C-alpha cells in the first residue's frame, strides 16, 4: 500500500494505492491521526490506485470520514 498527501488550496488530497486490507489498514491510522491534527476543511480521498479493498480498509475510511465530519470538515471519495 502506498499513501501520499497533497495540499490543494483548502483541501488535502490523499491518494492510496495498492491493497487496503486487514494487513495494511492499521498502517494508515498514524497517518490519518496526523492528518486530523491539521484540522483540514476538506479531504479528497482518491482510491483510483487501489487494486483491492476489504472490510478493514472500508472501516478505516469510515472512521476517518466520521472524524472529519465531526470536526466540521467535508469529505469526498473519488476514483
Each language-model region and where it sits:
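Short beta-strand/loop segment at the start of cytosolic alpha/beta domains
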Residues: 1-15
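Amphipathic alpha-helical interaction surfaces in cytosolic regulatory modules
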Residues: 19-79
Amino acid at each position: 500500500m502506498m499513501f501520499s498527501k497533497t495540499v490543494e488550496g483548502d483541501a488535502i488530497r490523499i491518494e492510496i494505492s495498492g491493497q487496503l486490507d486487514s494487513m495494511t489498514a492499521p498502517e494508515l491510522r498514524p497517518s490519518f491521526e496526523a492528518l486530523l491534527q491539521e484540522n483540514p476543511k476538506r479531504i479528497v480521498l482518491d482510491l483510483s490506485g487501489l487494486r483491492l479493498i476489504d472490510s478493514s480498509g472500508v472501516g478505516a475510511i469510515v472512521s476517518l470520514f466520521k472524524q472529519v465530519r465531526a470536526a466540521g470538515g467535508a469529505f469526498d471519495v473519488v476514483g
